[in-house]
Regions:
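Short, hydrophobic secondary-structure boundary micro-motifs
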Residues: 81, 126-127, 276-277, 308, ...
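Sec/Tat signal peptide C-region and signal peptidase I cleavage site
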Residues: 45-52
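Short, glycine-/small- and polar/acidic-enriched structural segments
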Residues: 52-193, 199-209, 225-226, 233
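Secondary-structure end/capping motifs
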Residues: 247-335
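Bacterial N-terminal signal peptides
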Residues: 21-23, 29-44
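Pocket-lining segment of extracytoplasmic ligand-binding domains
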Residues: 112-113, 190-194, 198-284
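N-terminal secretory signal peptides that target proteins for export/translocation
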Residues: 1-25
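Hinge/cleft segment of the Venus flytrap/periplasmic-binding protein
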Residues: 326-328, 332-354
Length: 354
């Protein structure tokens, strides 16, 4: 599953739409992953002490839970914490490709895309949960449809196998419906606003912001009938790390996590939030007023909330349960063939020690 992509075919760019793909964002990294990862891991294992001291290379992209790091970058907080980092800006899918090719120590990804990336050969471990989507992913319907139940017998546009396909499945299940009760129209995420506006027989589309907002603008009277706020924890975002880097640089990764929680506090504090939003919006080419709703649709996780989400459980309030759900979706929709060992992708030790 993948996310913001060039309007989230990968979480590509919120300013110029993008987001999840593995069904949560395959935020594109399937093809080159296995061979490139083998090369990357070999290089990592053979790293000299000088190489080990190099800045941590972290890929980030246009999603509020990743853009939040821009605050720390511009404030110099990583230097204050004594950790040398090199944050590299990508379209979402390109960041996963770079990670799979061994060019990054870590990358910002949805929990579902972490599984997709690993299934493709690029092993990774989620050590920090930055947020969960809380409204930025939507099922947008046009009149006369006003409820999820109203989708029965209708055509619904989604990018099959991506995160908002998962959102649609979740919406249907919560309202005693199933996919066979409607007809899926497969389209690229960035094409969905046009599909909704121009196709008279397409009743709704599933997309993330800002693509969802574009659909709402194009179709008078359209409205979200189900969002990720209705299924908190369905889509987590994380910093997922190459296991070799994690093993050799644990102290540095602990510092990165500590800085993250400083970012969350700064963003959530009403006194400093305007400055934080100014920094974040500038990174993606939006005004603070344009960016604030996107931030509000993202539930950033502080240390206490992350500790709770890192607790093993079967529900969506646990990243374990959420990832099992994503794994089942990925297998069911042939994103990959073999179910993944979810626990192998999650290591809460450093975050829980904060």
């Amino acid at each position: 599953m993948k996310r913001f992509e060039s309007v989230r075919t990968s979480r590509a760019s919120l300013a110029a739409p993008a987001r999840f793909a593995s069904a949560l964002r395959v935020r594109g990294a399937l093809a080159a992953a296995a061979a490139a990862l083998a090369l990357g891991l070999t290089a990592g294992l053979a790293a000299t002490p000088a190489q080990a001291a190099a800045p941590l290379a972290i890929g980030y992209s246009d999603w509020p839970g990743f853009v939040a790091f821009q605050v720390a970058i511009e404030k110099g907080w990583f230097k204050e914490a004594g950790v040398d980092v090199n944050f590299q800006w990508f379209d979402y899918s390109a960041s996963l490709d770079a990670f799979s090719a061994g060019k990054l120590d870590a990358v910002g990804a949805t929990n579902g895309d972490a599984l997709v990336t690993g299934a493709s050969g690029a092993k990774n471990v989620m050590i920090l949960l930055t947020d969960y989507s809380s409204g930025n992913d939507m099922i947008v319907a046009k009149p006369p449809v006003r409820t999820v139940e109203g989708l029965k017998g209708k055509k619904v546009g989604v990018e099959v196998g991506l995160v908002d396909h998962l959102l649609l499945d979740t919406a249907l299940a919560k309202h005693a419906l199933k996919e066979s009760d409607l007809t899926l129209v497969n389209a690229k995420t960035n094409e969905l606003p046009q599909v909704l506006a121009s196709s008279g027989d397409v009743a709704a589309v599933g997309a993330w912001q800002p693509t969802a907002g574009e659909a709402l603008k194009r179709v008078p009277g359209s409205r979200p009938i189900f969002t990720s706020a209705d299924a908190p924890g369905l889509i987590y975002d994380a910093i997922t790390v190459n296991p070799v880097s994690l093993q050799s640089r644990k102290a540095d990764w602990a510092k990165v996590i500590k800085v993250w929680y400083r970012c969350v506090a700064y963003i959530n504090d009403p006194k400093t939030q305007p400055d934080a939003v100014k920094i974040m919006s500038a990174r993606v080419g939006l005004t603070p007023a344009q960016y604030l709703p996107l931030l509000k649709g993202t539930h950033l996780l502080d240390s206490a909330a992350a500790r709770k989400a890192f607790t093993k459980g079967d529900g969506l309030d646990s990243v374990y349960g959420s990832s099992v759900n994503a794994d089942k979706f990925n297998v069911r929709n042939a994103v990959y063939k073999q179910s993944q060992n979810v626990s192998a992708y999650i290591d809460p030790a450093l975050a829980n020690a904060q």
